[in-house]
């Protein structure tokens, strides 16, 4: 077997709308292409020996052991690889269950789809599954050592990339509230919400957390001085920089017992408490110097260690922290008790799980020695042996919830302290013998104020009630049930995507909002180009959704991006599907128009239930998407007599209809007339029906988002098929005694659309400079030739600079084949170089003629036209003598009239 390609999906996709995290592996079975598993000697036995846990996979039989039944009876190797990849992840602690295996149009090549939690782990699992299956085919077994290494590698990948427990709690709460989130470049840096409404967090610091507060909290001594000056009970202490000053510092704080800790440490690193001798003090000083140059010496206060969490000025949780310890059973040594407690599945390395495994350090041995024990000692039953002086969870400690026990005065004091320091989220370390009584009564003290406090002890205490502290954070960042979202409008289809996206963005600008939009020619925010290029995939969508100024996102969503990575967002408010026609077939294992329709349907299916799928009622494949989506439906149609639309409106639906020469919104008993087509520059005076359809779709998408009819009308009237607003989309130039038209038509449907306009526009001679992308099918090029023969009087066949792997001259030959099939006496020539072909077309243009250029490079075509001298770009305006498609006379011009639909 051979892996041909591995792709990672991260959003709604062709395989699943709900499951975003999928690996798609293109697998060539090679010699196993026609060999089911039951025909491979020893394969079943070898697979069961390697992975007996596959017994739990149901598969199509729908019962325990169902998958292994399939293997015994005979199934193809791609299917087995799918299940093995899922099981390897499961054994590494990643609970995944979704998978699909489908044969492609190429015999023996399969697409194997597996769910993942961690991207790198998912890709590793796919490769390991192929290795495992191939090994069993070749040798009858997969070495146990290799399997163990695979599982360990997967565990390491999962641990290294997983969100920390605090971040995970925040993300889960965001998902619960329907707030979208995304992980940014740093491991714990996340974004909650989109655009102008988004917030960012790193660990438990928010973008509202003041840097002065953080800096102050990190300077333990400065914090203590400020709090002491405010009458807050804090430990007596001082800061030293040299060992020679230690003895004097001990005297200053009142003698032993003392605490020594680094000035700017965290997570308990370098801290030693309950120091009772000079030898211990020297060792503690050296340990603290490993973390910081400046050392704090404080008086040691006896009591219980409490963490009080304050969010947005309010105490939301309190936990008593208990240092790492074991409890004797009268039989086991301390070393054995530690090993036993570390087997707890809730304990992991670092912050992986709710508890951390106990690891010993210098202070551990000191504590044992002070208690008269060694690791080989057997403590009596019930005896507590402390292994750490500090109670941090990161050193193996545990937590007991005390939220309901804290005294009101202590709540007031904690909230006051956090305001003094200036933090929105803070964790206070309080030492007192009883948190239910005021600190002042028990000589309790506030030891530290921590920025970015951990949430583990509160969301998963060892004893007591788990507290939803992440909910308090969400309430602070998104008050009054705010969602953090901005309107997202996604536009897809075979043709018209860029024009419709630009028009929709232009209409939305009439509302005064900042619009971010992506197209095949670039990413834009407001009136400014952010990045040029074909930016119709998820990465470009993220640029818009991460921008803090964007209030509305209009995203052109192309086929390629959906296939490669899925959508760049979880859900949209509006999903527009313009049409589905033959293009890109045979690429990415999308071989039929129906498969292409299923791919583009992802946009319609990913709309929020309270949003709208805007669908073309005149395209049966697009109209059928209404059955797949949970969103509301809005249709647009060029046919005012559409039965589908009539029934939809009767049921209370909304539609955009081209009727009597008007673009109209129809809802219930009323028709809201927006504008006559001939008044809309984009429609070329009403002579470009495909542009009318694009305008209908954009108007309807804006309308269902509560953009007013007046604002829609203003947008339509001021948007032009020009180089500045729609480069490469029906750009018409007046070159004196002839005209040139530039359009990025590159598939049969777009050729037909351009042809309809050309026939309406001129009766003069029509010259076409035609071609197509090299990665299309042979039959597609033949079809382009046939259409060109029907449209143009003279044809110049050229090829793209980038032939996309096709031999030079091949595409041209296929196009000319199509030309001669339709018109054997057609006038044509082949000039493969695009620049030469365009110049030839312009050179031979007759008076009153039209040169139609369908280029690979729009910018090059426009530049060559402008080199011709004085060139005027024509923008079609209202023309009373213009023939409008399907125009009817005698219609009232009011914007709202009663309708009979």
From Swiss-Prot:
GO biological process terms held by the UniProt record: biosynthetic process
Listed Pfam families? Cyanophycin_syn, Mur_ligase_C, Mur_ligase_M, RimK
Catalytic activity line of the entry: [L-4-(L-arginin-2-N-yl)aspartate](n) + L-aspartate + ATP = [L-4-(L-arginin-2-N-yl)aspartate](n)-L-aspartate + ADP + phosphate + H(+); [L-4-(L-arginin-2-N-yl)aspartate](n)-L-aspartate + L-arginine + ATP = [L-4-(L-arginin-2-N-yl)aspartate](n+1) + ADP + phosphate + H(+)
- Domain ATP-grasp intervals: 224-478
What NCBIfam families does the record tag this protein with?
Answer: cya_phycin_syn, PRK14016.1
The record's family statement is:
In the C-terminal section; belongs to the MurCDEF family.
Function summary: Catalyzes the ATP-dependent polymerization of arginine and aspartate to multi-L-arginyl-poly-L-aspartic acid (cyanophycin; a water-insoluble reserve polymer).
What name goes with this protein?
Answer: Cyanophycin synthetase
Q: In which organism is this protein found? A: Trichormus variabilis (strain ATCC 29413 / PCC 7937)
């Amino acid at each position: 077997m051979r892996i041909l390609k591995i792709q990672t999906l991260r959003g709604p996709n062709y395989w699943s709308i709900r499951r975003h995290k999928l690996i798609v592996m293109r697998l060539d079975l090679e010699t196993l292409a026609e060999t089911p598993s039951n025909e491979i000697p020893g394969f079943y036995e070898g697979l069961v020996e390697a992975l007996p846990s596959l017994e739990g996979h149901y598969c199509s039989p729908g019962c325990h052991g169902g998958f292994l039944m399939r293997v015994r009876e005979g199934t193809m190797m791609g299917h087995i690889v799918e299940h093995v990849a899922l099981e390897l992840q499961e054994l590494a602690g990643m609970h995944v269950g979704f998978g699909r295996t489908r044969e492609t149009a190429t015999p023996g090549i399969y697409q194997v789809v597996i769910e993942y939690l961690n991207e790198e782990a998912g890709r590793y699992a796919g490769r390991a599954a192929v290795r495992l299956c191939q090994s069993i085919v070749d040798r009858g077994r997969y070495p146990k050592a290799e399997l163990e290494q695979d599982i360990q590698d997967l565990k390491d990948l999962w641990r290294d990339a997983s969100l920390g427990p605090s971040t995970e709690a925040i993300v889960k709460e965001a998902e619960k509230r329907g707030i979208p989130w995304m992980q940014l470049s740093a491991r714990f840096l996340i974004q909650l919400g989109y655009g102008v409404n988004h917030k960012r967090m790193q660990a438990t610091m928010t973008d509202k957390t003041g840097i002065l507060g953080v800096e102050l909290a990190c300077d333990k001594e400065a914090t203590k001085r400020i709090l002491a000056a405010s009458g807050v009970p804090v430990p007596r202490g001082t800061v030293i920089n040299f060992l020679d000053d230690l003895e004097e510092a001990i005297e200053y704080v009142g003698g032993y017992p003392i605490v020594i800790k680094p000035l700017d440490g965290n997570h308990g690193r370098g801290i030693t408490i309950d120091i009772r001798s000079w030898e211990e003090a020297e060792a503690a000083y050296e340990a603290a110097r490993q973390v910081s140059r400046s050392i704090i010496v404080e008086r040691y206060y006896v009591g219980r260690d409490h963490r009080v969490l304050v969010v947005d000025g309010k105490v939301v949780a309190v936990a008593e922290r208990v240092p790492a310890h074991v409890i004797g059973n009268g039989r086991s040594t301390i070393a054995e008790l530690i090993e036993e407690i570390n087997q707890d599945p809730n304990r992991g390395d670092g912050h992986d799980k709710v508890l951390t495994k106990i690891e010993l350090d210098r202070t551990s041995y000191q504590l044992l020695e002070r208690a008269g024990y060694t690791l080989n000692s057997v403590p009596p039953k019930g005896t507590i042996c402390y292994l750490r002086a500090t109670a941090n969870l990161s050193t193996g400690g545990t937590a007991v919830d005390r939220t309901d026990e804290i005294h009101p005065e202590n709540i007031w004091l904690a909230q006051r302290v956090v305001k003094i320091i200036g933090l929105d989220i803070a964790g206070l370390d309080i030492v007192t013998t009883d948190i239910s009584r005021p600190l002042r009564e028990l000589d309790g003290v506030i030891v530290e104020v921590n920025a970015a406090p951990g949430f583990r002890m509160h969301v998963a205490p060892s004893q007591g009630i788990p507290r939803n502290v992440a909910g308090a954070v969400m309430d602070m960042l998104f008050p009054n049930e705010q969602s953090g979202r901005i309107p997202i409008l996604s536009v897809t289809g075979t043709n018209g995507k860029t024009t419709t996206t630009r028009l929709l963005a232009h209409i939305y600008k009439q509302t005064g909002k900042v619009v971010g939009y992506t197209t095949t020619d670039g990413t834009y925010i407001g009136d400014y180009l952010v990045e040029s290029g074909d930016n119709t995939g998820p990465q470009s969508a993220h640029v818009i959704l991460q921008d803090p100024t964007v209030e509305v996102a209009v995203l052109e969503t192309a086929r390629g991006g959906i296939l490669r990575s899925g959508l760049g967002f979880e859900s949209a408010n509006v999903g527009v599907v313009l049409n589905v026609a033959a293009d890109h077939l045979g690429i990415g294992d999308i071989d039929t128009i129906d498969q292409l329709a299923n791919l583009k349907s992802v946009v319609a299916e990913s709309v929020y239930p309270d949003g709208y799928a805007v669908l073309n009622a005149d395209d049966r494949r697009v109209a059928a998407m209404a059955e797949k989506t949970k969103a509301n439906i809005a249709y647009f149609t060029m046919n005012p007599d559409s039965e589908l639309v009539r029934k939809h409106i009767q049921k209370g639906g909304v539609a955009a209809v081209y009727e009597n020469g008007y673009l109209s919104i129809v809802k219930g008993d009323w028709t809201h007339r927006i504008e006559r087509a001939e008044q809309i520059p984009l429609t070329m005076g009403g002579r470009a029906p495909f542009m009318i359809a694009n305008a209908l779709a954009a108007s309807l998408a804006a309308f269902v988002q509560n953009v007013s009819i007046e604002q829609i009308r203003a947008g339509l009237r001021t948007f032009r098929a020009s180089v500045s607003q729609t480069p490469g989309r029906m750009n018409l130039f007046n070159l004196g005694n002839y005209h040139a038209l530039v359009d990025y038509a590159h598939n049969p449907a777009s050729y037909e659309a351009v042809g309809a306009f050309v026939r309406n526009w001129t009766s003069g001679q029509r010259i076409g400079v035609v071609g197509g992308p090299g990665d299309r099918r042979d039959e597609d090029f033949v079809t382009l030739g046939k259409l060109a023969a029907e449209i143009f009087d003279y044809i110049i066949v050229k090829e793209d600079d980038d032939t996309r792997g096709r031999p030079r001259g091949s595409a041209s030959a296929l196009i000319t084949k199509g030309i001669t099939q339709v018109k054997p006496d057609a006038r044509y020539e082949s000039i493969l170089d695009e620049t030469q072909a365009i110049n030839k077309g312009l050179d031979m243009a007759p008076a009153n003629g039209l040169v139609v250029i369908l280029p690979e490079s729009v910018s090059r075509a426009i530049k060559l036209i402008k080199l011709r001298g004085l060139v005027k770009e024509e923008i079609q305006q209202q023309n009373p003598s213009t023939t409008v498609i399907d125009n009817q006379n005698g219609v009232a011009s009011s914007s709202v009239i009663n309708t009979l639909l």
